[in-house]
Amino acid sequence: MNSIQENEHVTVFREFLKIRTDHPTPDYESSTKFLVEKAKEYNIPYEVYRETGTPIVLMKIEGLEPNLKTVLLNSHVDVVPAVHDSWKVDPFSAWKDESGNIFGRGTQDMKCVCMQFLEVARRIVQSGQKLKRTLHLSFVPDEEIGGSGKGMEKFVYTEKFRQLNIGLCLDEGLASPTNDFTVFYGERAPWWVHITAVGNAGHGSRFIEGTAIEKLMRTINKMLAFRQEQFESLHHGQHECGKKLGDVTSLNLTVLKAGIPIDHSNNFSYNVIPTQAEAGFDIRIPPTVNLDQFLDQIKEWTAEEGLSFKFASYIPKNEMTKLDSDNKWWENFKESCKKMDINLVTEIFPAATDSRFIRNLGIPAFGFSPINNTPILLHDHNEFLNEKVYLRGIDIFMGIIPNLVNME
């Protein structure tokens, strides 16, 4: 679709979508250059922090009372890969159809919120409005690969982050297919568990007892029985009080490995019972579950002789933000949305975002993407966002963020 007379904010959004920050080789230098150029154009003070190994772009609008706790608008600039053959258009072309639907990797997760935060900052600076509290923006890398190493997980433990003096963080949420908007106050802890079984070997023609695969299968069956219990719990209530995905523990068998390879090829010896078998599980645990008790459950599942486990991903702590009248940030956020006739639905985020690193420091964090009446397409083929929904999202943030920053 021709971009003549296109809204300038939509044009900026589409330009950012075209930058290839997809894994495994995200072009962070180009995204950093883009953000720095916009900060200069919008007269927003900025710096590029590189101590974690990959550029983190920080912007700041200083408040009249800089000693007060500040508000952080956090967004990640990286996106997941896209299978080009499964898209109807180039996933990095930011193509827009006649209905105003913009197709591209990152339209929902989360380059939309990146640019909406930036536009809010631009409007605040342009208006000359004086803020009570300082407003920070952070554009971070590597969220899509867990935020570890060079992303938010490392950044939160730096002196630079401590100096930001954060009182509240706003981060990404999810699209809502209904007229409601979803706000997330916690998320499930991602545990990736690798189980190894060791047992007796022998010829495939015999009934060998105590084999590795037998031991592993017994454990797998126990864990899949637990999975079925959680599945039934999720789908038990179909009324308004029914559980959401973030309320239950999901468990999926994602890795299976066994067999004796022949000459390091893809062929295996079918007549040899292997001495070792392995399985990997992706487990997502809601913050309402005691993690120490769940760890004991895994130990019980793997208690049989010859079984052991280790974590490929492990989070020992998983805090959530309280949504009660004692939380002044929440009361302000909720009241701001009420004034705009926005109906909020509160949930636990079913996957993981950088917010978990913030919450685990004891800092309140809300996951909120102002996207409604839109199918949830993060990480999916043909991910899109309508330009009208995008522009309304900027207005929604303008109705929320200044109120938070000017809060007593």
Swiss-Prot record:
Family according to the record: Belongs to the peptidase M20A family.
Subcellular location: Cytoplasm
Transmembrane annotation, as ranges: none
Assembly, per entry: Homodimer.
Gene assigned in the entry: acy1
Catalytic residue list: 78, 143
Record protein name field: Aminoacylase-1
GO biological process: amino acid metabolic process
Cofactor annotation remark: Binds 2 Zn(2+) ions per subunit.
Keyword Transferase: no
Cofactor(s), names only, from the UniProt record: Zn(2+)
Organism of derivation: Dictyostelium discoideum
CDD domains: M20_AcylaseI_like
